[in-house]
Amino acid sequence: MLIQRGGLKVVAGLGISGVSAVNFLHEQGYQVAVTDSRPTPPGHDQIPAGVKTSFGQLDQELLLQAEEIILSPGLAPQLPEIQAAIAKGISVVGDIQLLRRATDVPIVAITGSNAKSTVTTLIGLMAKDAGKKVAVGGNLGRPALDLLKDQPELLVLELSSFQLETTSHLNAEVAVVLNMSEDHLDRHGNMLGYHQAKHRIFQGAKKVVFNRDDALSRPLVPDTTPMQSFGLNAPDLNQYGVLRDADGTLWLARGLQRLIKSSDLYIQGMHNVANALACLALGEAIGLPMESMLETLKRFKGLEHRCEYVKTVRDVRYYNDSKGTNVGATLAAIDGLGAAIEVKKGKVALILGGQGKGQDFSPLRSSIEKYAKVVVLIGEDAPVIEQAIQGATKILHAATLKEAVELCQRETQAEDVVLLSPACASFDMFKSYNDRGQQFVACVNSLV
């Protein structure tokens, strides 16, 4: 029989992190209850016996009995039921706060509007390859509290603005906001609210990494906090950046020291150069050897369906960016790959289309004009996209993804890149963006 400790802990909102919090608190011997507005929330069957449940609405009465409320990231603190509890002086936290209380293992904390998952995965691999017992998760993969079961010596956490809203004094070993662009404004009210939520990651941080190309990523921290920057320009002493040789060769660099050519990476594009530099700075902050980090970087092929290198066929590289389901993501992929191959006069053959979700596709125009030799359109919104980009470059149509890949092969030559980055949802032709990406990989593998 577990000893009951302290007052009642009420978990509001189930889902992956809610279930994780309930189980963690129950194992710690706390009196736990859980409430969710859904009648049968996901994970309701994974709640241990002895935990009181109240489903179908957020149980105001139960929340007001709590000593502390653990809020799932999907629920906004602004909800009236939560505000009523706050007005009564009841503490409201999230699973990341519980994690910080439960362990003093060093944390590498990562947030940003884009690239969080790539950087979190890569720095996790760098730490593992350097011999660290590391656990990786948070907003990506495994919920944060579950990571403690591994008894790690280092935690690498991807954190969303929703998770950071209910976290204070994370006291990370090193923290970074990779970049900031408009996102989740429906939840945070405006850009300032979003910015404030993201920057909670720096509270109590021992070291800080920031993106000097993005002023909004730079924190207000005490002058005594060690800070290191990364950016896509020539770096100052001890900072990370890029150096260019006279022949156009691009190097990732620390100060004046050239570390690795961008062409030696599987992950291509300037956005990925920035991600790699961020990882090197984070790795340095936790004492990972440079040699080992560069080895990991050379082998890293990126995340599945996110500008993922597939293979080279007849000196043409193929990339799967099926996760590019909106115009912003596809722009980053075109600009990133286009700028990287421009040095060798390479061009992009782009596969676009699917369900457009009412988006405006005209922002793609100038990048397509600059970097694409051909666009092959697929899916139900092909006519809408064609209208938006008409005249920017050569446009072809394909009835299937297989036909699109074959057309791209016909249109390309050595040093070119074929990129699937549809800027659309996939449900007109595929089960999901995963399915679309897997079919693309299969089509590429069948080329000769």
Swiss-Prot record:
List the InterPro entries hit by this protein, alphabetically.
Answer: Mur-like_cat_sf, Mur_ligase_C, Mur_ligase_C_dom_sf, Mur_ligase_cen, MurD
Q: Does the keyword Transmembrane helix apply?
A: no
Reaction(s) catalysed (UniProt annotation): UDP-N-acetyl-alpha-D-muramoyl-L-alanine + D-glutamate + ATP = UDP-N-acetyl-alpha-D-muramoyl-L-alanyl-D-glutamate + ADP + phosphate + H(+)
Q: Which SUPFAM superfamilies match?
A: MurCD N-terminal domain, MurD-like peptide ligases, catalytic domain, MurD-like peptide ligases, peptide-binding domain
EC number of the protein: 6.3.2.9
Q: Output one GO MF annotation.
A: ATP binding
Keywords (alphabetical) are: ATP-binding, Cell cycle, Cell division, Cell shape, Cell wall biogenesis/degradation, Cytoplasm, Ligase, Nucleotide-binding, Peptidoglycan synthesis
Superkingdom to which the source organism belongs: Bacteria
Which of the seven top EC classes does this enzyme belong to? ligase
Give an example GO biological process. regulation of cell shape
- Its main localization is cytoplasm
| Stated family | Belongs to the MurCDEF family.
Q: What does this protein do?
A: Cell wall formation. Catalyzes the addition of glutamate to the nucleotide precursor UDP-N-acetylmuramoyl-L-alanine (UMA).
Q: What is this protein called?
A: UDP-N-acetylmuramoylalanine--D-glutamate ligase
